[in-house]
Amino acid sequence: DGKAVALPELIDDGRPVLLNFIYTSCTAICPPMTRIFAEVQDKLGADRARVRIVSVSIDPEEDTPKRLRDYARQFGAAEPWVFLTGSSAASESVQKAFNAYRPDKMGHTPLTFLRRAPGQPWVRLDGLAQAPQILAELRPMLAP
């Protein structure tokens, strides 16, 4: 919706986090990754609000808030799933923090990151993780 947010504050609210990197003009892996996240969100049912889902744009020059909003709508993404963009430097910094940076966006690989809570280690799923695999990692993170 165009509001400025700080990623650390967004993902450190105590909820488990599910995160990936996408860009809206991608025609290869981004649509399937986004579809899979939508399936995960749907299958979470009543637990959906207990998980912070974040998709970070790796193409901030093109991915405006409006473009990301339209992209999210196309996949049925709903709160608390957020799509983030920012400066090129901020996008690169976040990608590097997750060891996911590729100088050429066309060369980016499908990665999924999950974390139970602030201070906990991140789980990294390399490749196009399917909804059952993501849910198998995520559901235990929801247990008390």
Language model segments and positions:
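Extracytoplasmic
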Residues: D12-P16, R48-I53, D63, G107-P110
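Short active-site neighborhood of thiol/selenol oxidoreductases, capturing the structured segment around
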Residues: L7-P31, R35-F37
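Soluble non-cytosolic domains of exported or imported proteins
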Residues: N20, T27-P31, E62, T85, ...
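Short beta-turn/strand-loop junction motif enriched in small, turn-promoting residues
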Residues: K3, D42, N99-Y101
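Thiol/selenol-based redox catalytic cores and closely related redox-interacting motifs
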Residues: A77-Q133
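Second-shell loop/turn segments in exported
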Residues: L19, Y23-T27, S55-I58, P80-W81, ...
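Structural microenvironment flanking redox-active thiols in thiol-disulfide oxidoreductases
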Residues: P32-W81, S88-V94
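Non-globular targeting/processing and membrane-anchoring segments
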Residues: D1-A6, L135-P144
